[in-house]
Swiss-Prot record:
Ranges for region Disordered: 1-46, 178-208, 229-410, 440-461
GO terms for cellular component: cell division site; cellular bud tip
Biased composition (Polar residues): 1-10, 25-46, 197-208, 264-284, 392-410
Gene3D superfamilies: Tetratricopeptide repeat domain
Compositional bias ranges of the Basic and acidic residues kind: 14-24
Note: Present with 377 molecules/cell in log phase SD medium.
Protein's recorded name: Protein DSF2
Biased composition (Basic residues): 374-385
Compositional bias (Low complexity): 238-256, 285-294, 303-318, 335-350
Disruption phenotype: Rescues temperature-sensitivity of MPT5 deletion. Partially suppresses the hydroxyurea (HU) sensitivity of MPT5 deletion.
Record GO biological process: negative regulation of G2/M transition of mitotic cell cycle
C-alpha cells in the first residue's frame, strides 16, 4: 500500500514538474523579448572567451527552432539548405564588391592623380555617361604623350629638336569649316576649288590658316596639359570674339586672323618674363628663325628657338600710352635699378616687347679696378669715344643698289651707303632673344700702351657660359676687330681661325660629322703659323674680316641695348654680302628693332638670305612629296644655316601676309617644304599640319601629312596624338 502511494506520488510529482515547465515556457514565449542593448554594447567591448554568457540571443534560437519544427526537415536537408544560403550570401557580397571597387592605376609622375576605372560597369552607369568617354579613358594610348612613352613621362619629356609641341589629330577638321559660309561647303558637288594658275589667288575670300592653335611651347606644356583638351574644344567659340588676338598667359592662342597682319602683331603664346626665363631650353636645334648668333662660328650651334617672329610673340607686350613721357635711357652698364621706362617716339611702334632675363648664370663680377676706372674717367674721354663712333658710322663704304626679283615683284634693297634713320636713341631693349655671349680670348701679341687702351675701350666685357661650346679666335693683327676697322682695312684678306669644343648642347655624344676641329700652333714672332682645318659644312663662302667683325659687334651692341648701332652694323655686314647679316637685318626690319619697321623690305632681305636665284624654278615649280623619299636618312639632322631659317621665315611671311597684300598659303607651304627638306624640324611639323587640314586653296592629304609627321618624329619633334601616322593606309608611296 505504501509502495503504491510512493509510486503515485512520484509520478504525480514528475507530471506536475512537466506542467510547470510547459507553463514557464509558454509565459516566456508570450512575454515581450528582453532588451539586449546592454549585452550588445558589452559584446562590442569585451570578449566572452572566459565567460559563460552566450552571445546569441534567445529570440533567435526560439525563432529558428520554430521554423525548423514547422518544416520538418531531415538532417541532410538542413545541411543542403544551409549551403544554399551561404552561396547566395557570397554571390550578393561579390556583386556589391564588383560595383564599388576596381583595379587602381597609379601614375608615377608628380601632380598626376591616381586613375580608377571600373572593369564591369553596370548598365545604369553606362547609360548615365557617354560610352565613348569610358572607352577612350580605358585606352592606353590616351595616357601616352608620344610613341610608347607612359603618361608618367609627360612632364619630364623635353624634345631636343623643336621649340614647340604639335597637336596632331587625324579626323579633327572643324576649324576650317567653322569660318566658311554655308554655300562654301566642300561636300557639295557644285563647289569648285580656286584656280591656282591665275596669279595664285583664291576666289573665295580665304581666311589665313591659323596654324598657331595646333602648337604649344614646350616651356608651357606641363602647365597646360591638364586643360589642353577643354581649351582646344572651346577655342572655336572664342575665335569670333577675339578681334585683336588677345591672349593670357594661361590659355593657348586659338584666335584666327582674317585680315593681313598689321604692325600690331599677334602674340600666340604669350607668357610672363619670369616664366620665360625659368623655362627656356637651349639645345642643338637647327629649327629657328629666332636663332640669333653670338659670333660667326655659332651658326651650327644655334639657340633652341623656332622662329624669330614667334619669339617676338612669346614675350609679354607693353602697351605704351600717351602718358609715358619720362624717358630713362637704357644703359649697357649694370645698374642697381631693375626697372626702366620706355619713351614713346613717332617712329616707335605701339607694341614693344620687353626682353626676359637671361636663363643662365653669367659671370658679372664687379671688381674694384673697374670702379676705379669709372671714377677717374674724364668727360672728355667719353665725348671723344662718342665722336669716334659717330664718325665711324658715317664712314663711306661700298655703295650699290641691289634688285631682287621674287614672285614677279621687284624688291629694291636700299643703298648700303645710306645711313639709318635716327628715330630715337631710347628704343626698347628688345630684339632678338638674349643669347649666351661667348668669351673670346685674344692671342697675346706685342702692343703699345695706346693700343691696349683702345682695345679695352672698344671691346666690352663678355660673359662666359660653361654649358655651351666655346669659341676662341686668334688674330694676327691686334687692330683687327676694333671700331675703326672700316677705315684701317688691309689689302690682304684675313680669315680668323675658329676652334670649336666638342661639347654637345643636349648632353649627348657630339656629332663628329658636323664639327670642324682646328688644330693650330703659334710659333715665335716672324715664323709662319701652321694650321690644319677642315672645311665648314654650312658656310660655303669664307668669312671676311669685315663681315665677322660687324656681326660680332652688332650682337654685342644688341646685348648692351644699343639697337640703332646694332642695326647699323648688320646693314654694313649686308653690304659685304653676308647671308647671316641678311637674315638678322631682315628680322630687325620686320620687328622695328633699331630701324623703322618695313615688312616689304624685310621680306627682301630674308629672300636674299635664302640664296635663291630663280623664285619660280627653285620654289614654285618644286614639288616636294615626302612619300617619294627613298630614305629618311637623306634629310640632314642639322639644317644648314642661315639658309634653312631664312626659308622658314619666308614661309611664315607668306602664311601671315607680312610684306604683301594678302597671305598666300601655297607659296608659304612651298617655302616650308623646302626648309623641311634641309632638315628644319618646325618646317616639317608645320607642313604636316597644313596638309592635314582642308583650306580654301587645297584639299587635305592625310598620307602626305603623315609622311611629314613621321620624318619630324624621327628627327625628335614632340607630336601629341601621333599614333595614326604609322597606320598602314598612310604608309603608301605617293605618285611620282
Amino acid at each position: 500500500m505504501n509502495q503504491n502511494l510512493k509510486n503515485t506520488s512520484w509520478a504525480d510529482r514528475i507530471g506536475s514538474d512537466d506542467q510547470e515547465r510547459k507553463a514557464n515556457s509558454s509565459e516566456v514565449s508570450q512575454s515581450p523579448p528582453p532588451n539586449n542593448s546592454f549585452e550588445s554594447s558589452m559584446d562590442s567591448q569585451f570578449s566572452y572567451a572566459h565567460s559563460n554568457k552566450s552571445s546569441i540571443s534567445f529570440e533567435s534560437i526560439q525563432t529558428t527552432e520554430r521554423l525548423l519544427d514547422k518544416l520538418d526537415l531531415s538532417l541532410e536537408d538542413e545541411l543542403i539548405l544551409q549551403e544554399a544560403l551561404l552561396e547566395e550570401e557570397n554571390a550578393s557580397r561579390n556583386s556589391q564588391l564588383s560595383q564599388t571597387s576596381g583595379p587602381t592605376l597609379c601614375m608615377p609622375a608628380s601632380e598626376f592623380p591616381s586613375l580608377r576605372y571600373r572593369t564591369n560597369p553596370s548598365p545604369t552607369y553606362i547609360q548615365a555617361r557617354d560610352r565613348s568617354l569610358i572607352i577612350d579613358n580605358l585606352k592606353e594610348k590616351d595616357s601616352t604623350l608620344r610613341g610608347k612613352y607612359s603618361s608618367g613621362k609627360v612632364e619630364r619629356h623635353l624634345p631636343v629638336k623643336s621649340r614647340y609641341s604639335y597637336i596632331v589629330e587625324e579626323d579633327y577638321d572643324s576649324e576650317t569649316f567653322s569660318g566658311m559660309k554655308p554655300q562654301m561647303n566642300r561636300n557639295e558637288k557644285d563647289y569648285k576649288y580656286p584656280n591656282l594658275e591665275n596669279g595664285n589667288r583664291s576666289t573665295n575670300s580665304p581666311n589665313p590658316f591659323n596654324f598657331e592653335k595646333y602648337r604649344i611651347e614646350n616651356t608651357r606644356l606641363h602647365h597646360l596639359y591638364p586643360t589642353l583638351i577643354s581649351d582646344n574644344n572651346t577655342s572655336v567659340d572664342n575665335n569670333a570674339n577675339s578681334k585683336n588676338n588677345r591672349t593670357t598667359s594661361n590659355n593657348i592662342n586659338t584666335s584666327t586672323k582674317t585680315d593681313r597682319i598689321s604692325e600690331k602683331q599677334s602674340c600666340p603664346n604669350e607668357f610672363t618674363t619670369t616664366q620665360k626665363s625659368n623655362c627656356l631650353y637651349r639645345n642643338g636645334s637647327s629649327t629657328s628663325t629666332n636663332t640669333s648668333f653670338s659670333e660667326v662660328g655659332q651658326l651650327s650651334k644655334p639657340k633652341t628657338q623656332s622662329s624669330f617672329e614667334s619669339e617676338s610673340s612669346s614675350f609679354s607686350k607693353l602697351k605704351l600710352t600717351k602718358s609715358d613721357t619720362t624717358p630713362i635711357k637704357p644703359s649697357p652698364k649694370r645698374s642697381n635699378s631693375s626697372t626702366s621706362t620706355i619713351t614713346k617716339t613717332n617712329t616707335m611702334t605701339n607694341d614693344i616687347s620687353l626682353p626676359p632675363t637671361p636663363p643662365y648664370k653669367a659671370h658679372k663680377k664687379k671688381t674694384s679696378l673697374n670702379s676705379l676706372k669709372k671714377l677717374f674717367k674724364s668727360p672728355r674721354t667719353r665725348a671723344k669715344n662718342k665722336k669716334d663712333l659717330e664718325s665711324e658710322g658715317s664712314s663711306p663704304i661700298r655703295s650699290a643698289t641691289n634688285s631682287l626679283d621674287f614672285s614677279g615683284e621687284n624688291i629694291q634693297l636700299p643703298s648700303t651707303s645710306s645711313t639709318i634713320n635716327n628715330s630715337s636713341p631710347h628704343l626698347a631693349r628688345y630684339i632678338f632673344p638674349p643669347n649666351p655671349v661667348f668669351h673670346f680670348k685674344t692671342a697675346s701679341t706685342p702692343q703699345s700702351s695706346t693700343d691696349k687702351k683702345k682695345n679695352s675701350k672698344a671691346r666690352p666685357n663678355r660673359t662666359h657660359l660653361r654649358t655651351f661650346s666655346d669659341f676662341h679666335t686668334t688674330e694676327k693683327d691686334s687692330k683687327i676687330g676694333e671700331l675703326s676697322a672700316l677705315t684701317e682695312q688691309s689689302n690682304k684678306p684675313y680669315h680668323p681661325k675658329v676652334r670649336r669644343r666638342t661639347l654637345s648642347l643636349d648632353g649627348m655624344l657630339p656629332n663628329n660629322s658636323t664639327q670642324c676641329m682646328d688644330s693650330f700652333s703659334h710659333k715665335k714672332e716672324g715664323s709662319n703659323a701652321t694650321s690644319k682645318c677642315g672645311k665648314l659644312k654650312f658656310h660655303p663662302e669664307p668669312y671676311d674680316n669685315d663681315e665677322s667683325s660687324h656681326i660680332g659687334q652688332a650682337i654685342t651692341m644688341r646685348h648692351q641695348g644699343k639697337l640703332e648701332e646694332s642695326a647699323q652694323r648688320l646693314k654694313k655686314a649686308c653690304a659685304c654680302g653676308n647671308k647671316t647679316a641678311f637674315l638678322l637685318y631682315g628680322l630687325a626690319l620686320r620687328h622695328g628693332c633699331g630701324v623703322d619697321k618695313n615688312l616689304k623690305l624685310s621680306l627682301g632681305y630674308l629672300m636674299a638670305a635664302t640664296d635663291i636665284k630663280s623664285f619660280a624654278a627653285e620654289v614654285l615649280d618644286l614639288d616636294i612629296n615626302p612619300l617619294n623619299f627613298a630614305s629618311m636618312d637623306d634629310i640632314p639632322d642639322i639644317a644648314p644655316e642661315p639658309t634653312a631659317p631664312a626659308l622658314y621665315e619666308c614661309g611664315m611671311a607668306y602664311l601671315k601676309g607680312l610684306g604683301m597684300d594678302h597671305p598666300d598659303e601655297r607659296k608659304g607651304l612651298k617655302f616650308l617644304e623646302k626648309a623641311a627638306l634641309l632638315g628644319h624640324v618646325d618646317s616639317m611639323c608645320l607642313s604636316g599640319t597644313i596638309w592635314s587640314k582642308t583650306s580654301n586653296v587645297k584639299k587635305r592629304d592625310l598620307a602626305r601629312a603623315a609622311a611629314w609627321f613621321r620624318i619630324a618624329d624621327k628627327k625628335g619633334a614632340n607630336l601629341l596624338g601621333s599614333d595614326w601616322i604609322y597606320k598602314e593606309k598612310y604608309m603608301k608611296q605617293g605618285p611620282k
